[in-house]
Amino acid sequence: MSPSTTSPLSILSSTVLLLTISSRLQPALAQGASNALTFGDTPPGYTFATYDYKAASSPRPASPAEYSNDALAVLWDQLGPITLGPVNSVQEAGADADSARFAQPGVLHGYVPSYVRSVETAKLPGSFVWGVAASAYQIEGAADAEGKGPSVWDLLAHRGAVVADNTTGDVVASHYWLYKQDIARMKALGIPAFSPSFSWPRFFPFGRGPVNEEAVRHYDDVVREMVRAGIALHVALFHWDMPLALFNEYGAWVDRKVIDDFFNYAKFVISRYDRYVDTWYTFNEPQYCNWQFSVYPRGDLLPVFNNFTGGTPTRFICSHLTLLAHAKVAKWYKEEFKGRGRITFKNSGNYGEPNSTSEGDRIAVQRSQDFTLGVFGGPWTDGDYPQSVKETLGDILPTLTQEEKDMIKGSCDFFAIDGYSSYTAYETPGGVEACQSNQSNPAWPECHGQTSVGPDGFILGPPGDQHVSWLVNAPVGLRRYLNQITKELFPAVKDIVVTEFGFAEPFENDWPRRSPALWDLRRADYFQGYLDNILAAVVEDGVNVTGAWGWALYDNFEWFEGLSTRFGLQYVNYTDLTRTPKASMFQFLNWFK
């Protein structure tokens, strides 16, 4: 938020002032400095507030309906001290955004050549959308600034032994303060589109209740800068930064209350920004239910609700409620709000092949896809969960009512896949039938094994950083996956977008100087190979791929691995927050020229 922006609301320095404003006046919240941008009307029933938990008189336990500085202070007290970075106010774009200042590689070593010679002269359709992606918690920093409430990841990162390198998202790249410079640099580099996420606990510090006025001003200005720069905006509403207040109250994704709370957040954000956003992703990788619930909710980290303490039952109630929350937003967006853009959610999945020619290994691949993509893709394309999932889980899997099936089916406008890697799948000892009926089997409920090593003993492609053992550079796998998803798994989909793909250069964080890290040859090779195979899928295989998003805009907080694993197309110096484009950035950009 620009320091010069003034509030049209009266603000008391030590208390929270709540005002209900008629919907026709809501755009005035940011119009004073809008430079001709007009934001959408706020639906009836929303209130606004400013928050400053550091002005709390005395932090104390609060009721779920209390939205005060005191209550917010209690939430932040769960974390302990928050680290401040070197920048703590919005910075204007400077000369570093001048494209002429970007050093490029190639003096004595050229770029990576094309992999698929048959498509060297082929072109993608003019309507193909491409750009770079990032997420709020991973890049914004400013963890407790300007009224933001803590997210579950704020808490997890502040708990020892959760993040491998004991770093947090408190500061990271400080995009919250440096967004003007970042957007100017994207424009100078020639990046046509950006796919960030917005932060739920910034807009709603308690997950619901009054909207944080300062968050609105901030994101208003982010959108304004994007429009001014001519960069298309494609926004994810949820990228894992669940408001901690909702976890404290009812466990979030284990209680149906979360559907209405997410809808309340999504409705406000979409209503305000839809005219400037081309695509809404309700959720980033709802498969997060599969792996994050091995960590939470768990009694030593977070409260436990409804007898869910992690593991398989929690995974699938989370998956079920996430689907319903998505569908409720999508139905409103299409039928009532009649939005201008497209809406879907981003899936996490990788291409799998049988580890051998055996029938057991073939079934292992199918089960792998059923339990990752099928749980989420089946209901919106075919109207229900995969049969193998239902048979294995029985009563553990919540049943979709006919009304819910009708709401979910067709709720996505296209299939979005975050496709990074590939693997082989194999039958577990004893076979799938024995595993299916034995919940104590370590492989249950998926009842298959996975490896990145092929049957010939070779790894399927050059490996990524040692801290992301699942990641290999296997570009042909992505091409086959795009064919498999659209022609075999979900033939009803009209088009598919690769919403994330990227690579963690091995040992990149170990260099004592920045300059060696900038020549990230394996990452450059990765992007060349993956883009070549996306193009081949389009022009040679007839797959309707309509977009691709490189991950990531720059180095960021990589969840359980922290800051020491780097996925960025730009190098971030976490001491002074300077960003420098890597060789992979130019490999990526030059491919589209």
Q: Where are these predicted regions, by residue range?
A:
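Active-site region of glycoside hydrolase catalytic domains
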Residues: 31-127, 131-157, 206-207, 220-593
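Active-site-adjacent substrate/metal-binding segments within catalytic domains
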Residues: 141-219
